[in-house]
């Protein structure tokens, strides 16, 4: 298993799989709790990524709607 950081899309897919598992109600309680905890952590990471992307986009756009130089990406 590599230490490569997963992309936003990969994490979102993992979260969707966890939600689907939990919605079926067919997994044991202990596993459901573990999956719920993983899902909450993924959700938090995804939210941070979205907030960071939003801040970057706000910095890029000038008040008049023109684009500024993108230094950080």
Curated annotation (Swiss-Prot):
The lineage of its organism: Bacteria, Bacillati, Bacillota, Bacilli, Lactobacillales. Coiled coil: none annotated. Transmembrane segments: none annotated. It is found in: Cytoplasm. It holds the Pfam family Exonuc_VII_S. This is Exodeoxyribonuclease 7 small subunit. It is an enzyme of class 3 (hydrolase). GO terms for cellular component: cytosol; exodeoxyribonuclease VII complex. It catalyses: Exonucleolytic cleavage in either 5'- to 3'- or 3'- to 5'-direction to yield nucleoside 5'-phosphates. GO terms for biological process: DNA catabolic process. Keywords: Cytoplasm, Exonuclease, Hydrolase, Nuclease. Heterooligomer composed of large and small subunits. One of its GO terms (molecular function) is exodeoxyribonuclease VII activity. Belongs to the XseB family. Its EC number is 3.1.11.6. Bidirectionally degrades single-stranded DNA into large acid-insoluble oligonucleotides, which are then degraded further into small acid-soluble oligonucleotides.
